[in-house]
Amino acid sequence: MKEDAGNPLHLTSLNHVSVLCRSVDESMNFYQKVLGFIPIRRPESLNFEGAWLFGHGIGIHLLCAPEPEKLPKKTAINPKDNHISFQCESMGVVEKKLEEMGIDYVRALVEEGGIQVDQLFFHDPDGFMIEICNCDSLPVVPLVGEMARSCSRVKLHQMVQPQPQTQIHQVVYP
């Protein structure tokens, strides 16, 4: 196997994110009805309560916390906290649906070089943060080397011409 300095582990994609939860059923309901994931078969050899879901090219593995009462309580929505982010087709549609479902969210905005990225942040039932954005409009510019076209089209082995380096100058959080 030829060594690749830019990808030493020869990774190909993100497979799944595991999330500890108080109630597997409640979390499954959220990930299905709010984010559109579907339940998939989970190996029977896993001898603990959990569920696997799949959607948008990745898996979500829900793991029932052994001591649910010790999981951190939901806190204020903080866009700078750990989270997973999903690209969407229409921020307006997402915001309307969140309001219809009674889900509290925080809106944020990133502006860079005339490009505006809208972000919505909210929690799952256990306080794990979810971001929905239109981040695909923001180019992915490595600090060294070549530039990828955008978030959804990144292929490390097929990057395009080098671009001038820029940094995000302003991040506006409510």
Swiss-Prot record:
UniProt KW Cell membrane keyword: yes
Protein name stated in the entry: Glyoxylase I 4
Gene Ontology process terms (BP): cellular detoxification of methylglyoxal; defense response; regulation of abscisic acid-activated signaling pathway; regulation of jasmonic acid mediated signaling pathway; regulation of salicylic acid mediated signaling pathway; response to cold; response to heat; response to jasmonic acid
Tissue-specificity statement: Mostly expressed in roots, and, to a lower extent, in leaves, flowers, seeds and siliques.
GO molecular function, one term: lyase activity
Active site: E131
Phenotype on disruption: General stress phenotype, characterized by compromised methylglyoxal (MG) scavenging, accumulation of reactive oxygen species (ROS), stomatal closure, and reduced fitness associated with reduced leaf area and dry weight, as well as prolonged flowering time. Increased susceptibility to the pathogenic fungus Plectospherella cucumerina which triggers mainly the jasmonate (JA)-mediated defense signaling pathway. Abnormal cross-talk between salicylic acid (SA) and jasmonic acid (JA) signaling pathways.
Keyword flag Hydrolase: no
Gene Ontology cellular-component annotations: cytoplasm; plasma membrane
Induction: Accumulates in response to abiotic stresses such as cold, heat, drought, oxidative stress, genotoxic compounds, wounding, osmotic stress and UV-B. Slightly induced by salt (NaCl) and nickel ions Ni(2+). Strongly induced by methylglyoxal (MG).
Family: Belongs to the glyoxalase I family.
Keywords per UniProt: Cell membrane, Cytoplasm, Lyase, Membrane, Plant defense, Stress response
Domain VOC: residue ranges: 13-135
Compartments, record wording: Cell membrane; Cytoplasm
Function: Involved in the detoxification and scavenging of methylglyoxal (MG), a cytotoxic aldehyde produced in response to primary metabolism alteration observed during biotic and abiotic stresses. Modulates cross-talk between salicylic acid (SA) and jasmonic acid (JA) signaling pathways during defense responses to pathogens such as Botrytis cinerea.
InterPro entries: Glyas_Bleomycin-R_OHBP_Dase, Glyas_Fos-R_dOase_dom, VOC
Alphabetical list of Pfam families matching this protein: Glyoxalase (PF00903)
Taxonomic superkingdom: Eukaryota
